[in-house]
Amino acid sequence: MFDKKVYCQRRALLTERLRSGVLLLPGLAPSPVNFAANPYPFRQDSSFLYYCGLNQPNFTLLIDIDSGRETLYGPEDSLEDVIWTGPRPSLNELATRVGIAFADSPERMKMAVQEALAADRTVHYLPSYRPDQLLTLSRLLAVSPERVNEGASQDLIKTVVFQRSVKTAGEVAEVESALGLCRKLFQTLLKHLRQENNAVALAGILEGIAKASGCRFAFPPIITSRGEILHNQPDNVPFKP
């Protein structure tokens, strides 16, 4: 995470350019592998991370652009949650970390969105790429899932692109750090290429290095001797000399 001033400045510029209405920015929920308690490794929505910095699931940011009120909505940990995860910061503590003044429950978020819609206010939101989030937005906005993305805010899309296209010194430092890790990964790949001689083993080595560095791949690694096949998944067939 960056300093909370960074997130405050990003949100301030966002609301300044949108001028009026309500901004709805949902984070992501866990995605189960084969049952609810066995989720895939969590990856937060990038736009939510950009404006909130919180890499935990089930949070939503709502900003009343006209009044400037920012509220982080999300669940408090139950006893069952604490048994699995240990004590974690409260919702209010998380909001404070990123400079958000108010925090409330998901139920109150639904009421706030419904009140905005009833008052015929513009609700700005981004297009959704996750089916579960499409359904959530469908229920919130009272439109069919097929029409949710049709109502996405073009002004919000343009503003997010405008902001995220310009990198601060802190962001550039993070990009350079990632490039340094990429260099290490390619050097390791060349070092082990003849010794391992199959894509699965090489992918495992590289994924281990990424995880040990506190990172993970944005998409599955493409390691193949058949460059004519796009997005070929690693297999254990030996490379031909």
Task: Give the positions of each predicted feature.
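Acidic/histidine-enriched ion/cofactor-binding microenvironments in catalytic or ligand-binding pockets
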Residues: 51-55, 64-66, 228-241
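Hydrophobic alpha-helical scaffolding
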Residues: 4, 165, 192-196, 232-235
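Active-site pocket-lining segments that scaffold enzyme catalytic pockets across diverse folds
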Residues: 171-214, 219
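A composition/biophysics-driven feature that prefers long, compositionally simple stretches
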Residues: 1-184
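Alpha-helix boundary/capping detector
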Residues: 98-99, 200-208, 232-236
